[in-house]
Amino acid sequence: ATSIALKIHFPLAWAVKPTLYKQFVGGETLQDCSAAINHLMKYNVKSTLDYSAESEQTPEGIQATFEETLRSIDFAKGNTNLAYAVFKPSTITTDELLAKASEKREELTIDDVRHFREFRERFMALCQRAYDNDVRILVDAEDYCFQDAIDALTDEAMRKFNKKRAIVFATLQMYRHDRMPYLRRIYDDAVAKGYIAGVKFVRGAYMEAERARAAALDYPDPICKDKQATDENY
């Protein structure tokens, strides 16, 4: 029913806001979130600021998301009720570029290289702002086809900003069977280069889509063979 209503542009806010909205959304602005943040802290539960609005992957949409994420990092400065800020790399570039940079780097055009450089600058600017404000920041995990490029930038950011304490955190989806070897590489690199690895563990969020894509494009399934294997990784 909800999907039909959205297709025909039927107004749902009157029903969603008092029900589902209250369960899943802290607020529409940073200031709106303050009440929920303060309420949770009464139970010794810290919050994480996550700008989850879906914007178009246009230059204007990407810039708007980037600027709002910067504001969320500034908002978290000195706020002991907040545990982390977070950003989703695919919201500050395009899916097409992330997939190409991860899987077909040899096919990157001059324009692709320029756009990736701009993406890297935005990525590092968010981490720099987190470092300057002493705010820990989570780099959200994404689809398998995007992750190699994200991992490379996250590794670079950890080497730069995690010298004294963990500021930048990678997110590892442990239903992927390649995440344990990657975790070992992070650890070895941190020891060798003298920084503190920041790692957040999650089980994973895209299993059906990942398996369907692997089958469609005929590459090995990146997901663990069963729940037990995921549990052991996690």
What are these regions (language model features)?
Residues 1-234:
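Positively charged, amphipathic and often flexible ligand-engagement surfaces
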